Amino acid sequence: MESQAKVKISDKAEGIIERDMQNSVIGRREISLKVYHMGSGTPSRKDIIKAIIQALGSQENLVVVRKISTSYGAGISNVKLHIYKSREILEKVEPKYLLDRDAGTKQKKGGSKGGQGAKG
C-alpha cells in the first residue's frame, strides 16, 4: 500500500509516510518515513513514536523505531519503524536493545571500570 500521508512531529519537524506495508505473516505494519527538520536536530525516537501514534492511531508499546539515518547537514532523516498487532509478537521478533532504546533506558555494558584491576 503506497501512501504519502503527512505526520507532524514537532514545530520544527514534519514527516511524510513514503511506504506503509502490511506484513500479515509477522503481524506488523512496516513504515518508511521521511522527516524534514531543516535548521534543527534529528527528532528523538520518542517524538517520532508520539507523532506516529497520533497520525495512525496505534499504542505506544506496539511501535518500534528500527532505524533513523540522517545525512550530515541535510536536515532530512529516513526513519524505518514497525507497528505490531500485539506486544507478544513484538517481543519475539525485535531485539531487546531496540526495545530498551525506544523506552529510553540504557543498557550497562559488561565489565568493570575504575581502579578495580591491578595497576603497576
Curated annotation (Swiss-Prot):
<dbReference type="InterPro" id="IPR053709">
    <property type="entry name" value="eRP_eS24_sf"/>
</dbReference>
<dbReference type="InterPro" id="IPR012678">
    <property type="entry name" value="Ribosomal_uL23/eL15/eS24_sf"/>
</dbReference>
<dbReference type="GO" id="GO:0006412">
    <property type="term" value="P:translation"/>
</dbReference>
<protein>
    <recommendedName>
        <fullName>Small ribosomal subunit protein eS24</fullName>
    </recommendedName>
</protein>
<dbReference type="GO" id="GO:1990904">
    <property type="term" value="C:ribonucleoprotein complex"/>
</dbReference>
<comment type="similarity">
    <text>Belongs to the eukaryotic ribosomal protein eS24 family.</text>
</comment>
<dbReference type="InterPro" id="IPR018098">
    <property type="entry name" value="Ribosomal_eS24_CS"/>
</dbReference>
<dbReference type="GO" id="GO:0003735">
    <property type="term" value="F:structural constituent of ribosome"/>
</dbReference>
<feature type="region of interest" description="Disordered">
    <location>
        <begin position="101"/>
        <end position="120"/>
    </location>
</feature>
<keyword id="KW-0689">Ribosomal protein</keyword>
<dbReference type="InterPro" id="IPR001976">
    <property type="entry name" value="Ribosomal_eS24"/>
</dbReference>
<dbReference type="Pfam" id="PF01282">
    <property type="entry name" value="Ribosomal_S24e"/>
</dbReference>
<dbReference type="GO" id="GO:0005840">
    <property type="term" value="C:ribosome"/>
</dbReference>
<keyword id="KW-0687">Ribonucleoprotein</keyword>
